[in-house]
Design a protein with these regions (language model features):
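Acidic/His-rich structured neighborhood in mature extracellular/periplasmic domains
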Residues: 53-174
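N-terminal mature-domain "stem" immediately C-terminal to a signal peptide or N-terminal signal-anchor/transmembrane
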Residues: 1-55
């Protein structure tokens, strides 16, 4: 699902109908982005739509939105890989619920967001190892995994970890 396109339309043009459609068609995804990822406040705050819009008005984030939309104008390859990979996973783990997938732009916060039977892919975290903005914030080892080819493996990994958590995962050596 291309949540990112509605998000981009709202954040680059201020088109309030796009925000309304985000809230109507993707209420959980919108709440997760605004409240949990960006931590801008609650979705019911009277001024949340303006706060959300203003957060992304930074020129760096505006460029990131435009770059992500251009880089991921076509996601057929990723959709195909997700379908094949999660199909195989379903064969290996009978009864595993197939999540729904959506793309978003998350301001370089998290690469994959797991919801209740949904997987959000933050396209801004997969712009390629040589993406200029990444060089300011990430080392070469980190940037190596911030490519299109890591989207499907990351989706598999984080979805499985949400179902089968590992003890003390955050404190394990990489």
């Amino acid at each position: 699902q291309r949540y990112d396109r509605l998000e981009s339309r709202y954040l680059t043009t201020g088109d309030f109908s796009a925000l309304q459609q985000m809230n109507t068609d993707y209420p959980i995804e919108t709440r997760t982005l605004i409240e949990k990822m960006l931590q801008l406040g609650t979705i019911t705050d009277a001024n949340i739509s303006n706060r959300f819009l203003m957060f992304y008005q930074d020129s760096t984030l505006q460029a990131l939105i435009a770059d992500a939309e251009a880089e991921y104008a076509n996601m057929e390859d990723i959709n195909k890989q997700l379908k094949e990979s999660f199909g195989r996973l379903g064969e290996w783990i009978p009864g595993l619920k197939q999540p729904s997938f959506y793309a978003q732009i998350g301001a370089l916060d998290q690469s994959i967001v797991i919801g209740e039977h949904s997987v959000g892919i933050s396209l801004d975290k997969y712009m390629g190892a040589e993406y200029p903005l990444y060089k300011k914030f990430y080392n070469a080892q980190q940037r190596k995994t911030m490519t299109r080819s890591y989207i499907v493996p990351d989706c598999l990994t984080f979805y499985l970890l949400s179902i089968y958590p590992m003890d003390d995962f955050d404190n394990r050596p990489q």
